[in-house]
């Protein structure tokens, strides 16, 4: 292999490395954003579950005492 060919291969590898570094950085940013969103969604889910668990079921009518819907 000639010196020129080796230099071309090195330049090609350097270009590929730069592209891979940029891709990794982009993927890392996307992963970070998704992790933040997931954490926020988990907090919201915990809040909703807590609200549902603390619902006062005494305010709900007993289905046996409700009048049937008009289609019956």
Curated annotation (Swiss-Prot):
It comes from the Bacteria. Transmembrane segments: none annotated. Gene3D superfamilies: 1.20.5.300. It holds the Pfam family SlyX. Belongs to the SlyX family. This is Protein SlyX homolog.
